[in-house]
Each structure stands twice: as C-alpha cells, then as structure tokens.
Amino acid sequence: VILFAATLGTQADQLIRRISGWKMSQAVVMQAAAAAMIEAYCDGWQEELKREFGKQGLYLRPRFSPGYGDFPLSCQLPFLRALQCQKRIGLTVTDSLILAPSKSVTAVIGLSRRDEKCHKHGCEVCEKTECPFRRDS
C-alpha cells in the first residue's frame, strides 16, 4: 500500500480568501481551478508511480482518500503523522478533520501483482447501505 499526501500550500488559500472579499464569482472559479490543479498533480504523480512499480511487475489500484465511501475522515491524522506532513509540506488537520491548507489530498493506493480492473465504483464498493447520499448503480 502506498500512502501519500499533496498540497498546493497556503498561498492558494490566501489567494482565494483575498479574491472572495471583492469578487465572489472569481473566487468560485479560483476554488474550482485550485481543486483541479491538486487533482491533476495527484494524477501525474500516480502515473509516475505506475511506471516505477510497473518495472517491478506491480500494478496500482485506484487512489482512495479518507472521506470517500466508508473510509473515515478520522484516518487523516494517522496519515499525516506517518508521512510527517506538518514538517515536510506544512499539511495539518483541523479538529473537524479537514485538511489545511484546503487544497490538499491524502490517499492510499493499493499495489497488486495482478493487473485487474476495478468493476465496482462509487456507491457500489461502499458498505454504508443506509447512507443518505447513496446512489443506485
């Protein structure tokens, strides 16, 4: 299993906060752009891992983050501790388990010796059958 964390840093939060004070519509666009940037960064990093582990005959499983499905947000703190995130990249978690800076990601990526596709996605893989957000697949 690979644990990883990434952040755009405090500058992204500061810029969004500053813009929201005078032009909310532009702040919303900046918020979306920053979210896309951190996801693109993680995707690129995952592709690099795919190449590196592929040389060893290993295949990556999909990236999965605390807060997805039944993977509790309470896992954020152990992630950050294990990866020494505060010291290395300035990433912390609030008392309400939200990452700070806000444009940040923690996730796990599984490794397998078999190249199998995931046939289940989203709500299909989650065991929370009574979830108010559950969608039929």
Segments and roles (model prediction):
Residues 56-135:
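Short terminal or interdomain "cap/linker" segment that borders an active site or interface and mediates
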